[in-house]
């Protein structure tokens, strides 16, 4: 049976979208051309808004209009554009630093899932905050873009660093 990927929406979340740190950057950037071809306009990469993300070009394309409005209404700090790599995939850079009360977020993970992370350092807390904010953005996108009406939605969270988004 042949599956029509053009009806599926894929959100791919990585700390290394427009942010070269290690090996996942190579994985995500090297498959973006093929993913963009398979999923078309339904392929979105989400990365951290670090203020000076390399290879990111902020755009004012019509495809961002509705999502820009709903993320603003929900006080989700996002920048929308393209990653300047082959395929020029759509990218949402997600602000997270001022989004959460660190203690409350970590308590909710402990309370809901038994994840004991109150003593976690910033190298743990920062990715949890980022990926949780990405979960909120994906939820907003699904509601705004009427994605569920067109086909299935997939969210791929790379590495442990993005696990908080799975739990959102």
Residue ranges: model-predicted function:
Residues 6, 45-150:
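A conserved catalytic-core segment of Leloir-type glycosyltransferases
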Residues 14-27, 56:
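A short, glycine/small-residue-rich beta-strand->loop->alpha-helix junction that serves as a flexible
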């Amino acid at each position: 049976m042949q599956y029509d990927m053009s009806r599926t929406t894929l959100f791919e979340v990585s700390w290394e979208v427009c942010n070269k740190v290690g090996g996942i950057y190579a994985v995500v950037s090297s498959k973006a051309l093929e993913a963009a071809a398979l999923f078309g306009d339904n392929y979105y990469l989400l990365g951290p808004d670090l203020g000076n993300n390399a290879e990111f070009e902020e755009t004012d394309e019509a495809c961002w209009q509705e999502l820009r409005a709903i993320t603003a209404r929900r006080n989700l700090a996002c920048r929308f554009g393209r990653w300047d790599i082959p395929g020029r995939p759509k990218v949402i850079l997600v602000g997270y630093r001022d989004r959460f009360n660190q203690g409350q977020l970590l308590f909710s993970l402990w309370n809901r899932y038994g994840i004991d992370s109150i003593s976690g350092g910033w190298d743990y807390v920062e990715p949890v905050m980022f990926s949780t904010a990405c979960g909120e953005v994906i939820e907003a996108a699904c509601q705004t873009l009427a994605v569920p009406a067109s086909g299935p939605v997939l969210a791929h969270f790379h590495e442990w660093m993005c696990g908080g988004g799975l739990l959102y």
